[in-house]
Amino acid sequence: MKKFTLYIGLMLVSLGAQSLEDVLKSDHRSDKNKARDVYRNPLETLNFFGIKNNMTVVELNPGGGWYQEILAPYLKNKGQYVTATYDADSDSEYRRNSYKAEMKRLKDNKKVYGEPLVVRLSGDVYGEKESADMVLSFRNYHNWIGKSEFEKLRAIYNTLKPGGVFGITDHRSDTIEDKKGYTCEPCLIRDAEAIGFRYIGASQINANPRDTKDYPGGVWNLPPTLSERGLDKKSIKKMQKKYKLIGESDRYTLKFVKP
């Protein structure tokens, strides 16, 4: 009986993983986005965080929607996808345009995404207090450093249910001080624990040992941005060819739980 129960349990886990795999293979994802799977490792990353399709999951600042096109369909039938995004009436033109672009994307993909919940990426909670099973942040933390990191971490903590998971990835610095897009992994762990989170562990699935982190324009010289910032105009093509071979940045992948 125990063996049978274990077998059924393994089958259910397998089916759950296959469901996420189906989303990743789906035609609604662009070939350009699928090509980045080798660097962003969405299946392994989300499985490390422990995502389930019946969860309420908040994604912070989805940006261009790379993870949104995975999370929203995956959670469509049994769970709830929540996007914490910029304000429509922000003083920043960039943020207003970002909001408009995301609302258009959600509308254009309604059949695939279902009915995502839109909340403000501001204040001391994202949506309702203790409403989320999981809050995810993909490459946002470097924008918070020195400005609002404690405010954001506190809002994440307030949003999660007890036992809820905070999963985060970002560009990893080899030093404490780095103003070129890379962030201090042990500093983040320290700050999250100070807020009240329990640190569960790290995965190296998004590590990249080829990333030397010494680029004139910072992490943005690497793919996918391939910024020309800081590069000599005469050597842009040569350097970008080099950066493409390096691939996307070296990133930490951390998991925390709200007790």
Residue locations for each model-derived region?
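Class I SAM-dependent methyltransferase Rossmann-like catalytic core
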Residues: 20-53
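Conserved class I S-adenosyl-L-methionine
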Residues: 53-63
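Short glycine-dipeptide loop
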Residues: 54, 77-78, 160-166
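A short glycine-rich, Lys/Arg-flanked "PGG" loop and its adjoining helix->strand segment in the class I
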Residues: 72, 149-162
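A short acidic, Gly/Pro-enriched loop at the edge of an enzyme's catalytic core
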Residues: 125-135
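Conserved beta-strand signature within the Rossmann-like core of class I S-adenosyl-L-methionine
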Residues: 163-175
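Conserved Class I S-adenosyl-L-methionine
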Residues: 179-203
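C-terminal lobe and adjacent flexible extensions of AdoMet/dcAdoMet transferase-like proteins
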Residues: 239-259
